């Protein structure tokens, strides 16, 4: 089994924001890509029901994905936020001491590349030239206090709209992707029961190592890459007791609403561009038995479809459930025979003490 704790530390610890250069983003994403190339299992399994769609997909070497809106867990890919943490950062940034530290750094020519990267439409040099040589500290403190009070009122009156935009926005982004789920094992009684029609279905074995490669697309901005710079976005699920904390995304939602209502022509600052990927790879520990790996696509920026073909890959083996009907067994056997796919049937072990097939 793969070390999911190690992957969690790597993924959650990788922060790519609006101030990161393309080179810096490439370096960070390369570490995730390297881990995935080194740790993707040789064998991954997908459990299927016997129906016309799954059998036709088998015949055509197709892997179909599903929108998160069709998943059975209501908390699937649904993050949380911590407003106290966010407000603490806001009030801290509005302290007069912090403000003067920033002014001094700007005057000395510091952090200019990062600010330009985050806010490309702003003339930073001209803004710095407009900073007076002498600043009235008392006046600045009063204005910062006024700004803090305004933000407090703004948040109080707009909070419900922020929360609505937070959940709708992030789930709309996730719904533009399609997901196919795989497991590291094919002998789980629960998996056969939940996803293969109580052993009346079948399980497909895939070799993703044979096709998983570094992406060769020359993207304009690597910072927006949610594929981890691979030709297929394939990664293990991280099982946790708590939903993923997407407070960084809530911060962007707050900015957008603030700029919109006050007609401020500024670029949005993104604190963590990998937020959506992190949400889609976080799942309740209740599902830990699945040992899931998730294949997901880039965004489909068109009309919503609950199911789509997302990859073409022939399975290397097929395992029929112990309770499969004779008719379906015959159909699957013929498909495997014609396509050169190894075919097995799961059997109950009546001699041992364990609940295994």
Please identify what each model-predicted range represents.
Residues 1-357:
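Partner-binding and oligomerization surfaces adjacent to conserved cores of proteins
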